């Protein structure tokens, strides 16, 4: 049940912020700024030095707020997946499908969201127990691909990541996205130390996601 509790919370966020950074403290501040703006799905990437330490700090900090779901991104192998899970990650994201990562996530009852790009990769992921896939990079795949995949995989839960912005967010949902992943368009101001701007952008994205969800009820 734990896996589906975390998965449900993740999907309910509507939008997952992809957090990167050159150093630990900047990445943590970016995460805090995004959450302050109402984006409560957080993919904390393991390209950040000592990401497991930051992940532990963040998951403990926000543990009492169940609407906030913090997971690990750019997880390339099973060792890193286990490290992230033990640090408190509530979901695992990778740029491509890795069967060993899928096994670890299944063992710990943690949702695994691999990046996929072809029907073959999608089928392999589904057969390994994956419930939500990431279409990456979304900017290359495009809206028509999301729509086309819904033909052979009508129940597929999809999170496009890469190329998602405030201006095209509604189009992604209309094409069949279950939720979206937002990266540089959301957090780019953090690179210049402008965390207030990150919060302001997150507020706009949160409002847009809520409007889209409301219109589909």
Residue ranges and their predicted role:
Residues 44-45, 85-87, 108, 118, ...:
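Glycine/Thr-rich beta-alpha phosphate-binding loop at enzyme active sites
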Residues 95-101, 135-143, 175-198:
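Glycine-rich phosphate-binding active-site loops on the catalytic face of alpha/beta enzymes
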Residues 80-125:
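Hydrophobic, well-structured mid-protein blocks that either form specific transmembrane helices
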Residues 77-87, 120-128, 164-180:
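Catalytic cores of alpha/beta
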Residues 20-23, 72-78, 94-98, 114-119, ...:
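Glycine-rich beta-to-alpha transition loops that act as phosphate-gripper elements at the mouths
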Residues 40, 90, 131, 178:
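Short acidic/polar active-site loop segments enriched in Thr and Asp
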Residues 1-79, 83-87, 107, 155, ...:
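Conserved N-terminal beta1-alpha1 strand-loop-helix module at the mouth
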